[in-house]
Design a protein with these regions (language model features):
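Active-site recognition of the HExxH zinc-binding catalytic motif
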Residues: 84-96
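Short, contiguous pre-domain boundary segments
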Residues: 1-13
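Short pre-active-site segment immediately N-terminal to the catalytic Zn-binding motif
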Residues: 33, 52, 65-87, 122-124
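Alpha-helical membrane-targeting segments
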Residues: 1, 47-56, 60-61, 98-119
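Short, solvent-exposed loop/turn segments at secondary-structure junctions
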Residues: 45-49, 65, 71-73, 91, ...
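Auxiliary, metal-adjacent structural segments of Zn-dependent hydrolase domains
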Residues: 11-61
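Metalloprotease/metallohydrolase-associated module, dominated by Zn2+-dependent proteases
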Residues: 7, 19-28, 35, 100-182
Length: 182
């Protein structure tokens, strides 16, 4: 059985833990009460057998998060790029809770583009990985501001294509995310 994290312990490879209080507060700012936060496990391990999960790839196929090199003991205390990744992965928890077949769609996620345009569609009209990117990119925009968002865009973590002026971006995210989280 995998090691379960005790308070103030550093999680070892192969260990699992629940969300920290800080992480819950962070994700509640995005998903409100639409996720059962007490049941979300974070693994410091490969989801795939024989450690086949790429060391720099996070996976969330079953409502639980699997990190290898990108694991942090508390993502709420991490830098903005790791918080973006954490919110992206928590988006898959949210999608699964809404009934999306995350495992099935995830089988081909390495083939799909995470890039998107904000063209007036609702979030629900985008594919799975683009939904998660839009949610995480907007989180970065709202939390770290336009310049923090632009920094991650320069690193190709934020994957929006098109116009990048602050007022237009703000308006387009609001339009795409209207009614979110449902």
């Amino acid at each position: 059985m995998a090691e379960k994290k005790q308070d103030n312990d550093k999680l070892k490879k192969g260990g699992i833990r629940l969300l920290t209080t800080g992480e819950i507060q962070l994700v509640q700012s995005v998903f409100a009460s639409t996720i059962n936060y007490a049941s979300v496990w974070i693994h410091k391990d490969s989801y795939l057998p024989f450690n086949l999960q790429n060391e720099n790839t996070a996976m969330t196929p079953n409502g639980e998060l699997y990190f290898r090199n990108q694991y942090h003991d508390d993502f709420s205390l991490s830098l903005d790029d790791m918080q973006h990744l954490f919110i992206h992965e928590m988006s898959h928890v949210w999608q699964r809770a809404r009934g999306m077949n995350v495992i099935g769609r995830g089988l081909v996620s390495w083939l799909v583009s995470y890039r998107y345009t904000l063209d007036g569609r609702l979030l629900s009209e985008y594919p799975m990985e683009q939904q998660a990117q839009i949610i995480a990119d907007n989180f970065t925009f709202q939390t770290h501001g336009y310049y923090g968002w632009q920094k991650l865009r320069g690193w190709e973590i934020v994957t929006l294509d098109g116009n990048t002026s602050e007022p237009i971006i703000r308006e387009m995210y609001q339009k795409t995310l209207r009614g979110f989280p449902w």
